[in-house]
């Protein structure tokens, strides 16, 4: 659960994604918290160290706003690139924030939105493979499919992270806070 007693604006947190079987999938270091509320967390990272489950490490190439909500089974990464804004949306459990990190279960399916507005549903085969391997329940399947529809509605209607204003407001806030560090 995310709330005011957690990190404050300008604090840095780690983000950890897990798979359904409990194994660590990926870790992002140093995401700056821009806003927390009872239901959501907005953050930003730039040139952040990412560690894969197999130990490989890489650095992100561009600033990315992140959006997590405790009631939705997706999170949204807004990548701010020279050729425009693109989005990578993970179908995932609602995030949990503890002293160690913000954590969620990644359920394989992703929606990518390109700067021209084109949308692609990715990793359907991986979702089916992992669903069989780890026995995703019918309830989880139903929840995830419903959340794909919610996500597409947000995309099509420019809601929340998909609005131009959101990107401007939160990226500018990140730049302000970065100058104060």
From Swiss-Prot:
Q: Gene3D superfamilies annotated for this entry?
A: FomD-like (2.40.380.10)
What keywords tag this UniProt record?
A: Hydrolase, Magnesium, Metal-binding
Among its keywords, does the record have Magnesium?
yes
Any Pfam family hit = DUF402
Which EC number applies?
3.6.1.15, 3.6.1.6
Reaction(s) catalysed by this chain, per the record, are: a ribonucleoside 5'-triphosphate + H2O = a ribonucleoside 5'-diphosphate + phosphate + H(+); a ribonucleoside 5'-diphosphate + H2O = a ribonucleoside 5'-phosphate + phosphate + H(+)
What function does this protein fulfil?
Has nucleoside phosphatase activity towards nucleoside triphosphates and nucleoside diphosphates.
Put simply, this protein is called Nucleoside triphosphate/diphosphate phosphatase
* Naturally occurring in which organism (per UniProt): Ligilactobacillus salivarius (strain UCC118)
Q: What is the lineage of its organism?
A: Bacteria, Bacillati, Bacillota, Bacilli, Lactobacillales
